[in-house]
Amino acid sequence: MRKPIAAANWKMNGDFSLLDDFAQANITSDKCETIFALPSVLLDRAQKLGLNALAGQDVSAQVKGAFTGEISASMLKMLGCQYCIIGHSERRQYHHEDEALLIEKWRRLKEAEITPIYCIGELQAEYDAHATQQALERQLRPILEENLVDHKTIIAYEPVWAIGTGKAATPDYAQHVHQMIRQIVAQNYASIAPAMRLLYGGSVKPDNAGLLICQADIDGFLIGGASLDVGLFTKIIETMK
């Protein structure tokens, strides 16, 4: 059975005060796993506060060296990270990250025994052109062919047209795409695909989380804006019970 995940992606938001609020709220559930993908400057404090589980929002493709501003997989491990997001649409858009780079990032995470949360999703133009499957295969195939996927791997589907727009995918459409992702993975990893956890990310809120989590191939959420509010995040988790 796939245990649901509620992953909070704070992006470039948050401070010590908000972190303390979440720690005091003691958001835990035996029905789902909570993951906090925090700005790197907050990870040390989060670890000391006992906030679990922790994730990086990105990682360097390099092991170490003269790469100003980068954070290595070993540094994330030192800060208590069990997970790390790679391939988020904002990294793809603003930093022009492609699959070749993401493969190297994945390798660094694997070497540090950190589980990747690999983000994929179609652009508005691809959605309008009914080219979602082609977009997902383009983002998945290079990874699948590198023999990097294992039973711990998490894939997050984030329709780019839904992120930060308030326009969430319908439950039926989200399920259709998640099923498609599982089928694509199964072509290379037939024994792993049924147990792989697939997350939905894209304007997740308490009022749509319940219908989304009921879908057969949706195993949780990668939550943006709503994860910055203790009350909203808690309500989303409650829908997963």
UniProtKB/Swiss-Prot annotation:
Enzyme class label: isomerase
Keywords attached to this entry: Cytoplasm, Gluconeogenesis, Glycolysis, Isomerase
PROSITE patterns linked: TIM_1 (PS00171), TIM_2 (PS51440)
Primary localization: cytoplasm
Annotated positions binding substrate: N9, W10, K11, G164, S203, G224, G225
SUPFAM superfamilies named in the record: Triosephosphate isomerase (TIM)
GO process annotations (BP): gluconeogenesis; glyceraldehyde-3-phosphate biosynthetic process; glycerol catabolic process; glycolytic process
Record-annotated active site: H88 (electrophile), E158 (proton acceptor)
Superkingdom of origin: Bacteria
Metabolic or biological pathway, per its Swiss-Prot or TrEMBL entry: Carbohydrate biosynthesis; gluconeogenesis; Carbohydrate degradation; glycolysis; D-glyceraldehyde 3-phosphate from glycerone phosphate: step 1/1
NCBIfam families associated with the record: tim (TIGR00419)
Primary role: Involved in the gluconeogenesis. Catalyzes stereospecifically the conversion of dihydroxyacetone phosphate (DHAP) to D-glyceraldehyde-3-phosphate (G3P).
Record-linked HAMAP family: TIM_B
Name of the protein described by the UniProt record: Triosephosphate isomerase
Organism field: Dichelobacter nodosus (strain VCS1703A)
Lineage: Bacteria, Pseudomonadati, Pseudomonadota, Gammaproteobacteria, Cardiobacteriales
Gene name linked to the record: tpiA
